[in-house]
Amino acid sequence: MSAPIVAVIGGGQLARMMQEEASALGIHLRALVEAADGSTGQVTPDAPVGAADDEAAVRAVVTGDGTDGPAGGPASVLTFEHEHQDSALLERLQAEGVSVQPTPQALTLARDKLAMRRMMSGAGLPQPAWAEIGGPQQESTEQMVDAIEAFAAEHGWPVVLKTPRGGYDGHGVLLVRSAESLRQREAAEWIASVARARAGQGDGRGAGGGGSLGGAAVTSLLVEQAIPFTRELAVLLARTPSGQVAVWPVAQTVQEDGMCAEVLAPAPGLDSAAVEEAELIGRTVAERAGVTGVLAVELFAVETFGEPTRLYVNELAMRPHNSGHWTQDGSVTSQFAQHLRAVLDLPLGATEATAHTTVMVN
């Protein structure tokens, strides 16, 4: 029996760590990488070079065209190390019978924060108050400013502006503290850039193209209530196409400049009711969205003495995640091995912690 072949789009550190686990599991990893000497290309024998939006390159990594020897032939499944994929291409492959995991439909919720918020609302999950800015009645800069001010009048300052797509590691997120700051500097440029895009005078990528708007074409913004959180948590789980779910202990994350700097697992001092709620939120998201592979749900926790802990969903990731790196040495099964198991619909590994506390520094 030949080894299963997992095709993965992306050549960064996450795909590299998938390769290490694939070798141990007897799985062949075929990675579409951005550079042959990049993080994944250095350690993966089968690593054709190409872009995630190059249809010919993506099809080749799925079919195995150009791959010789026992590793040739079509992949058992196509997966990813990042969410920034061509949805239309993935849907075409899916319609042709390719197993795409997570599915393009689920992946949309990780790529598009507005779609995610709508799904959360429909599922009744706890999240910050939010609104779309740049709708049909909000074409001009002043109309968008008025809409943000009206949102803040209801939910309070500060508010958080986000680009629906393209943001990562702190990019595409802006804290706005007052009505005055909304008309100054970066916030004003964000809003003006979106207004220009809606008027057909640009693509909304921000000042100078790209920049803090995250590098993606932006024709609307997401405004959210700023949650005065005590700490940030992450619930990490994996789900197979057949519906098996395995959840790791809830972890605490420490963010610096929008990036995960430290993780403590299990989250120290988190009460059992909050742990149960966090796990239920993760399971509900996975079931509601039909997630396959690893899912990370980032949460804000508001802890007040004598009151139940309140949790709010911040963002999602449908892939191995920085908050789960601790599982490599701190859990029976790492997130990278589990992701491979999950997308292949194999039995999931145990997720118990192997130490009282694991600390990961990113």
Annotated model-derived regions:
Residues G258-P268, E315-Q328:
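Short, flexible active-site loops
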Residues D65-G69, L107-A234, A238-V285:
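Active-site nucleotide/adenylate-binding loops and adjacent lid/helix of ATP-dependent enzymes
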Residues A246, L295, R310-E315:
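Protein kinase-like catalytic core scaffold
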Residues M1-R118, G122, G134-D146, G209-G210:
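ATP-binding N-terminal substructure of ATP-dependent carboxylate-amine bond-forming enzymes
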Residues E276-V297, A317-N362:
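Active-site "cap" helix and flanking loop/linker of ATP-utilizing ligase/carboxylase catalytic domains
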Residues G243-Q244, T304-R310:
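Short, solvent-exposed loop/turn segments that connect beta-strands within catalytic domains
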Residues A238-T240, F300-T304:
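Short beta-strand micro-motifs enriched in acidic
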